Curated annotation (Swiss-Prot):
Gene Ontology CC: one annotated term: cytosolic large ribosomal subunit
A molecular-function term among this protein's GO annotations: large ribosomal subunit rRNA binding
Function: Binds to 23S rRNA. Forms part of two intersubunit bridges in the 70S ribosome.
UniProt keyword Ribonucleoprotein, yes or no: yes
NCBIfam families in alphabetical order: rplN_bact
Family: Belongs to the universal ribosomal protein uL14 family.
SUPFAM superfamilies on file: Ribosomal protein L14
Domain of life per record: Bacteria
One Pfam family in the UniProt entry: Ribosomal_L14
CDD domains: Ribosomal_uL14 (cd00337)
PANTHER family named in the record: 50S/60S RIBOSOMAL PROTEIN L14/L23, LARGE RIBOSOMAL SUBUNIT PROTEIN UL14M
Annotated signal sequence range: none
Protein name: Large ribosomal subunit protein uL14
Length: 122
C-alpha cells in the first residue's frame, strides 16, 4: 500500500531513479494506492542524461508493492520494493523499457502498453 510521503523506485528508463508519492489520485479522502492505481509523484533522484529532472511532478502507475496483491484464487504476490512507471498527461509511459516484473492486474486496467514492455508478467 502506497500513501503520501512513500519513497518509490522508478522501474523504467525515463531517467528517474527515486520518487516520492505526493498524492493518491481518485477521490479526496483516498489514502492508499495499490497495484494498478495512478498516483502523483515528485522526482527525488534522477539520472544525469534522463528525460526527467529532480523536482519534476508526474503521474505514475504503481507496478510493484511490498504489501502485495491478493488474487481471487487465494494466492498473494508480494515484492521486495515499491516501484512505479512514470506517465505523461495522456497516461502513456514516458520510458521505452520497463525493469523488473509486473503483475497481471495491470492488464485489466488501461495499461496494456506497460504489460507488453515488461520482461515478465506474474
Amino acid at each position: 500500500m502506497i500513501q503520501m510521503q512513500t519513497k518509490l523506485k522508478v522501474a523504467d528508463n525515463s531517467g528517474g531513479v527515486k520518487a516520492m508519492c505526493i498524492k493518491v489520485l481518485g477521490g479526496s479522502k483516498r489514502r492508499y494506492a495499490n497495484i494498478g492505481d495512478v498516483i502523483k509523484v515528485s522526482i527525488k533522484e534522477a539520472a544525469s542524461r534522463g528525460k526527467v529532472k529532480k523536482g519534476d511532478v508526474y503521474d505514475a502507475v504503481v507496478v510493484r508493492t511490498a504489501h502485495g496483491v491478493r488474487r481471487s484464487d487465494g494466492s498473494c504476490i508480494r515484492f521486495d520494493n515499491n516501484a512505479i512507471v512514470l506517465l505523461n498527461t495522456k497516461l502513456e509511459p514516458i520510458g521505452t523499457r520497463i525493469f523488473g516484473p509486473v503483475t497481471r492486474e495491470l492488464r485489466s486496467a488501461q495499461f496494456m502498453k506497460i504489460v507488453s514492455l515488461a520482461p515478465e508478467v506474474l
